[in-house]
Design a protein with these regions (language model features):
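Membrane-embedded alpha-helical segments of integral membrane proteins
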Residues: 1-33
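Membrane-interfacial, low-structure loops and terminal tails that flank and connect transmembrane helices
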Residues: 33-72
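Hydrophobic membrane-insertion alpha-helices, especially the h-region
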Residues: 78-92
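Membrane/wall-proximal cationic-aromatic binding patches
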Residues: 94-178, 348-352, 360
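Conserved SGNH/GDSL esterase-like catalytic core that processes O-acyl groups on lipids
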Residues: 145, 154-240
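Short, amphipathic alpha-helical "lid/cap" segments that border enzyme active or binding sites
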Residues: 195, 199, 285, 289, ...
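Serine-dependent acyl-ester chemistry module
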Residues: 220-334, 339, 344-355, 359, ...
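Histidine-centered active-site loop/cap adjacent to the catalytic His
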Residues: 340, 360-396
Length: 396
């Protein structure tokens, strides 16, 4: 149950709060019983035959006024309690049953998703992969490493087997059958990585003696943002708008709703995507191009074949896709550098109406999108790997 993945202090606070709601309800019910008893007294007073008629009327009038005053106050109190109970139910329901992500890993629901579906499955190198990396040449297998960001690590996809990297390995080995060497795919993706970080990780991986046969950089179009101050300013402005109020930071439902409100506000005030698109027509692109060239040269030095795949922004797919020029820049680099590549925009655009994103607030690819990407990678980017592994086995 998802509640067991919540923080202990949250569970304690909600237990205390729920107990207070129960106590408040009991007090309201006691109040209602007392008002009912007072109302009965009014009836009895009006029926009272002893004493003067004027005295009975005065007594009934006083008690009746008190009952009427208490009655509307009780109704108001019950209404407030019902509203608070409803909001508490929404909070507990959200905490107990909602297991998803947001685009920026900014909500408590998303943080918990990472604790459930990512952190327990990290290998010794820190990557979300069921298999450990082995340094040195691996003569008995053919290795393919995928580097990338959260699109590669598969944010929002619960099962490892549903990621495109795991699907690629399964399909390549299925097509290989009993011939050739086993093909092993390693996922070296991480949330928030850009070109500069991936360049450093590629360098460190190769210098530490890891020798994949093919290294694929799954490039996401926001990988350029670390080189452009404008996009960094836009991101910081979003981060600065985050509240420190406990109701927005220590809950699940209210935290999510606050995030949605922030996203709506940011969409009207922050020009993140326009700046990002402009980056590819500015000198910033030359810095990214140089970094890609260095990755290619580093791979060549260690006898590793470098390839690329370009991921589009899924929420922008369509006839007026604003990042078409960015894909062209990347393709031109690959053609000039002799890098085999796969542009996923033409692959995914025909399926844009099938719902390729994790959810409305997270534009990372979902399981359906990962399946399409895996099929394209096997059929267009890595279609030669089966022949190569069969050829290598015959040479051995």
């Amino acid at each position: 149950m998802l509640l067991f993945w919540c923080e202990p202090d949250y569970l304690l606070a909600m237990a205390v709060w729920s107990a207070l709601l129960v106590v408040a309800l009991r007090m309201l019910l006691l109040w209602r019983r007392r008002l009912k008893a007072a109302s009965n007294e009014v009836v009895e007073a009006r029926r009272e035959r002893s004493g003067s008629k004027r005295s009975a009327q005065q007594t009934g009038s006083v008690v009746s006024g008190s009952v009427v005053s208490g009655s509307w106050k009780l109704k108001l109190a019950f209404s407030v309690w019902a509203l608070v109970a409803l909001l508490t139910s929404l909070e507990l329901g959200f905490a107990a049953f909602v297991d998803t992500t947001d685009a920026f890993n900014a909500t408590n629901v998303c943080h918990r998703w990472f604790r459930r579906h990512v952190d327990p499955y990290r290998n010794e190198a820190g990557f979300r992969d069921r298999r450990e990396l082995k340094a040195g040449p691996q003569d008995d297998v053919r290795q393919i490493y995928f580097f990338g960001d959260s699109f590669t690590i598969a944010q929002g996809v619960d099962r490892l087997d549903d990621r495109f990297t795991d699907r690629v390995e399964a399909e390549l080995n299925r097509r290989r059958g009993s011939t050739g060497k086993e093909i092993r795919v390693a996922n070296l993706g991480e949330f928030g990585w850009d070109v500069s970080l991936i360049e450093g990780m590629v360098r460190a991986t190769l210098e530490q003696g890891y020798r994949p046969d093919v290294l694929v950089y799954v490039y996401m179009l926001n990988d350029i943002e670390g080189y452009d101050p404008r996009t960094e300013i836009a991101i910081r402005s979003i981060q600065r708008s985050r509240s420190t109020f406990w109701l927005w930071t220590r809950t699940y439902f209210f935290n999510w709703m606050h995030f949605c409100w922030q996203q709506a506000q940011a969409g009207r005030t922050v020009d993140y995507f326009p700046h990002l698109a402009d980056s590819y027509d500015s000198p910033v692109w030359q810095n990214v191009r140089a970094a890609l060239q260095r990755i290619k040269e580093r791979c060549d030095e260690h006898g590793v074949e470098f390839r690329m795949a370009f991921f589009p922004f899924l929420h922008n797919l369509g006839p007026e896709y604003p990042f078409e020029h960015a894909h062209q820049k990347l393709a031109e680099f690959c053609d000039e550098a002799g890098v085999k590549y796969l542009d996923l925009e033409p692959v995914l655009t025909p399926h844009g109406d099938e719902g390729l994103m994790v959810n409305r607030f997270d534009n990372h690819p979902n399981e359906r999108c990962h399946a399409l990407v895996a099929e394209a990678i096997v059929g267009q980017l890595l279609q030669d790997q089966i022949e190569k592994t069969v050829g290598e086995e015959s040479l051995d």
